[in-house]
């Protein structure tokens, strides 16, 4: 039997198929790159559409930056230019309800951040010693001491006094320790001392509050 060889036509068909496959792969890669480049824009458009809400549907105002709705209809409220999203308004305005329709209104500034002062807890010292109710205002992490051990005591700023939290031990050379608190005044103008730590001969100790002026002292 004669051998059947591969003719020129068969080779051309294989080359054409290979070229077609290569073109398909290049087209698929190009389409993938185009889709990746277009995806962020599509997501941004979707976000804006969701913010604006459905066409003709109700849209709730942003309560955090919108002024409260007026109780009475302001003049010209229904004739104001309407909006559907904050992006349609100038920089310092928000799309809010003006009593008749959604329009660009002045944004309300966010509420201020309050830095609450620390309220110390009363602490029992053991035996007959205790601390009275803590002061109303305390400087955050402001330590102080009234013990004079040859050096200047760690005093508080003007208008504050040292509220003793730990009496220390003079015999052991341990100074007392406290926190700076704002001074309170009585009706007659005298400063109310938050606490004076007293020790009695029989060994008992207690803390008392009494009016007076000047720095706190350690009584023997």
From Swiss-Prot:
WAP domain segment(s): 59-108
Region (Disordered): 46-70, 199-220
Purpose: Has growth inhibitory activity.
Database matches in InterPro entries: Elafin-like_sf (IPR036645), WAP_dom (IPR008197), WFDC1 (IPR042357)
Lineage: superkingdom: Eukaryota
GO terms under biological process: negative regulation of cell growth; negative regulation of inflammatory response; negative regulation of wound healing; regulation of cell growth
Keywords of the record: Disulfide bond, Protease inhibitor, Secreted, Serine protease inhibitor, Signal
Pfam families the UniProt entry points to: WAP
Record-annotated disulphide pairs: 66-96, 78-100, 83-95, 89-104
MF terms in GO: serine-type endopeptidase inhibitor activity
Compartment(s): Secreted
Signal sequence residues: 1-31
Name listed for the protein in its UniProt record: WAP four-disulfide core domain protein 1
PANTHER family per record: WAP FOUR-DISULFIDE CORE DOMAIN PROTEIN 1
Gene Ontology, cellular component aspect: extracellular space
